[in-house]
Amino acid sequence: GIPYWTYNNGDEPLVAISLLDTSNIANQLDSTPRVFYLGGNPEVEFPETQEEQQERHQQKHSLPVGRRGGQHQQEEESEEQKDGNSVLSGFSSEFLAQTFNTEEDTAKRLRSPRDKRNQIVRVEGGLRIINPEGQQEEEEQEEEEKQRSEQGRNGLEETICSLKIRENIAQPARADLYNPRAGSISTANSLTLPILRYLRLSAEYVRLYRNGIYAPHWNINANSLLYVIRGEGRVRIVNSQGNAVFDNKVRKGQLVVVPQNFVVAEQAGEEEGLEYLVFKTNDRAAVSHVQQVFRATPADVLANAFGLRQRQVTELKLSGNRGPLVHPHSQSQSN
C-alpha cells in the first residue's frame, strides 16, 4: 500500500528481484498478489490474477449494493475508462480535472490511456532530485523504531474496566480535516479510543457538503465498510487493473465494501450533502491520498512518469493540492 518508484542512476543495467509476502499481517485481502500502479500503462504482471478478477467483474459488473443509479452516465464513461491499467485510469478525465484542479489535458495524461512505455520509463538527461543524507535517514529510522517499541508503555496503562468506550466523532470541533466549502473528516482509532485496540477496529466520519469531493485515496492496511447515514452522493472504487468495479449513487442506509488498497473517491450530490461512516478492520488504519503522493513525489519523476510539461507538474503539485477535501466550483473560481 506504500507508493514508491525506482531509478537506476548507474552506468550498468539493473536487475531487481522483488519478494511479495502475501502472508504479511498488514495484508487483509487474500494470498493473491496484486500490484497497483498510480501512473503509466503497465503490462499485466500476474495474468492469471487479472483473468480471474475480470471474470468476476464481468459477472457482477459492480458491487451489489443499493440502487444502480446513474447507469446511463456509467455507460457513457465506460469506453474512456477501459483504456490504461493504472488505478487513475478508472476515473474519468472530468472527475480528475475537478479533483486536482487541473486542465483537461493534464487530467487525460494522468489516466495514461495510450502510454506505450509500460512499467519502465527512460529518462532523458537524468533526474534532478534533492536527497537527504544517509545518516539523517538512519537516525529517523532509529527514532521511529524507538517510538514503536515504547508504544503502550507509559506507566499509566488503562485496565479493561476503566477504558473509555464512547467517542463522538461527529462533533464539528472534533474534525481532523476541514474545508469550509467541501466538508470535514474525523477519525477514531486506538490512539484516541484505546479500547479499539482490543477490537482491532477504527472508524472515520465524513461529511461532504453539496458537490463536495473526497479525493481518490486508499486504505494501506485495512478493509473498510462505508455506511451512509444522511444524504446522497456517488462512490467510485477502482481495482488494481484500473477497472471501476463500483460506480453508483448511494443513499441513506446503504452499505459499500471497499477492499484494502482499492482506490475510492466519494462526491456528494447537487441537491444535498453526503454523510457516512467508515468502519475499518485495523485499530490504526492508515490512509494514503493520491494528492499527497503527487506533492511528495519529485517534479522530474512526475514529469517523466506521466509525460507532463513543467507547467503542468507545478499545477498538479501546487495549484491542485489543497487537501483531500475538494469543492470543484470554489477551486475553479479561485484560479
Swiss-Prot record:
Keywords: Disulfide bond, Seed storage protein, Storage protein
Gene3D superfamilies per the UniProt record, alphabetical: Jelly Rolls (2.60.120.10)
Biased composition (Acidic residues): 135-144
Pfam families: Cupin_1
Chain spans, region Disordered: 47-87, 102-155
Compositionally biased intervals (Basic and acidic residues): 105-118
Chain ranges of the Cupin type-1 domain: 167-314
Gene Ontology terms, MF aspect: nutrient reservoir activity
Superkingdom in the source lineage: Eukaryota
Function: This protein found in the seeds of many leguminous and non-leguminous plants is the source of sulfur-containing amino acids in seed meals.
Subunit structure: Hexamer; each subunit is composed of an acidic and a basic chain derived from a single precursor and linked by a disulfide bond.
Family: Belongs to the 11S seed storage protein (globulins) family.
Official protein name in the record: Legumin type B
Organism the protein comes from: Vicia faba
